[in-house]
């Protein structure tokens, strides 16, 4: 299981790149200075038109990690309510190599 860094020291509200998720279990990890920011793992069931939060376990207001299980979809990280000193990084890993790609 390898981690892919999908967010590198983000300092503004916005979204990471979109990643194709084949299917199965994974893990999201976020770290950094939050300063009021909220970080959410989101999925799109329709190739990027609609985005919904994966769940409360993968919504962060402080550094942490969470497991998730989703069917084939696109994934991204959403950051909102950043503060003056917010600087956040995030990683996603898959249970099986090759389950995630740009």
Residue ranges and their predicted role:
Residues 13-22, 53-101:
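Beta-sandwich interaction modules
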Residues 3-14:
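Extracellular beta-rich ligand/substrate-recognition surface
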Residues 33-38:
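Short proline/glycine-enriched turn/loop motifs at strand-loop junctions of beta-rich domains
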Residues 28-32:
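Aromatic/hydrophobic beta-strand junction motif of beta-rich domains
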Residues 42-45:
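Conserved Ser/Thr-centered positions that define the repeating blades of beta-propeller domains
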Residues 24-26:
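Structural beta-strand segments of beta-rich domains
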Residues 2-5, 47-56:
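Surface-exposed loop/edge segments in extracytoplasmic proteins
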Residues 1, 101-102:
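Short intrinsically disordered terminal tails
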């Amino acid at each position: 299981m390898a981690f892919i860094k999908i967010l590198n020291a983000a300092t503004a509200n916005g979204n990471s790149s979109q990643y194709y998720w084949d299917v199965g279990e994974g893990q999201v990890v976020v770290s950094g200075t939050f300063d009021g920011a909220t970080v959410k793992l989101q999925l799109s069931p329709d190739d990027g038109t609609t985005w919904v939060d994966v769940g409360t376990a993968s919504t962060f207001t402080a550094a942490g990690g969470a497991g998730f299980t989703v069917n084939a979809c696109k994934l991204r990280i959403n950051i909102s309510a950043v503060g003056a000193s917010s600087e956040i990084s995030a990683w996603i890993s898959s249970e099986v190599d090759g389950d995630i790609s740009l």
